[in-house]
């Protein structure tokens, strides 16, 4: 599970593009806290602190505790808008969450034991169909990643979501089909040889 991140913020008295530009000139990033059956709260936070949090690599899969006016608000980052040229964060959205909340998150997939896959040892290629899985879980149960063991897989095999053991309390958001995450495909050289053999047989 990703560590909880902590950021300090202040409420915004004024909204609008002009006020937002003024905040950015001061090194602050405009943001909003919404959800949880409460009114949205316009805030701003230090740009450097936000950039540092983004640099952790698990920002969007972490609970972020925002300290605003002496109160701590548990949130999940939902979106960050970046400047198209400078790549500076221009705005951030935070969703209020509680321990009873259920959230949708995209979690990266990591493939393990590739050296134990007969198909890969023969020169097969791991064709990754999904680099992330859309999961449903409580905010405090968001995994850092999902590890998929490819030991034993042969060329032509497919890895479906049904073969993946998810952590306790974590479910796939897609439930209407047993979707493919990756396949072990034959190397192009092998395909070429098979094609040549077929062509020769046809000519003969």
Curated annotation (Swiss-Prot):
Segments of this protein annotated with the region Disordered: 1-23
Annotated SUPFAM superfamilies: Ribosomal protein L25-like (SSF50715)
Signal sequence coordinates: none
GO cellular component: cytosolic large ribosomal subunit
A Pfam family annotated for this UniProt entry: Ribosomal_L25p
Classification via InterPro entries: Rbsml_bL25/Gln-tRNA_synth_N, Ribosomal_bL25/Gln-tRNA_synth, Ribosomal_bL25_b-dom, Ribosomal_bL25_C, Ribosomal_bL25_long, Ribosomal_L25_dom, Ribosomal_uL5_bac-type
Alphabetical GO biological process terms: translation
CDD domains associated with the record: Ribosomal_L25_TL5_CTC (cd00495)
Gene Ontology MF term list: 5S rRNA binding; structural constituent of ribosome
Keyword Nucleotidyltransferase carried by entry: no
Annotated keywords: Ribonucleoprotein, Ribosomal protein, RNA-binding, rRNA-binding
Record carries keyword Amino-acid biosynthesis: no
HAMAP family for the chain: Ribosomal_bL25_CTC (MF_01334)
PANTHER family xrefs: RIBOSOMAL PROTEIN L25/GLN-TRNA SYNTHETASE, ANTI-CODON-BINDING DOMAIN-CONTAINING PROTEIN (PTHR33284), RIBOSOMAL PROTEIN L25_GLN-TRNA SYNTHETASE, ANTI-CODON-BINDING DOMAIN-CONTAINING PROTEIN (PTHR33284:SF1)
Family: Belongs to the bacterial ribosomal protein bL25 family. CTC subfamily.
Assembly information from the UniProt record: Part of the 50S ribosomal subunit; part of the 5S rRNA/L5/L18/L25 subcomplex. Contacts the 5S rRNA. Binds to the 5S rRNA independently of L5 and L18.
Role this protein plays: This is one of the proteins that binds to the 5S RNA in the ribosome where it forms part of the central protuberance.
UniProt-recorded name of the protein: Large ribosomal subunit protein bL25
Source species of the chain: Novosphingobium aromaticivorans (strain ATCC 700278 / DSM 12444 / CCUG 56034 / CIP 105152 / NBRC 16084 / F199)
Gene name for this UniProt entry: rplY
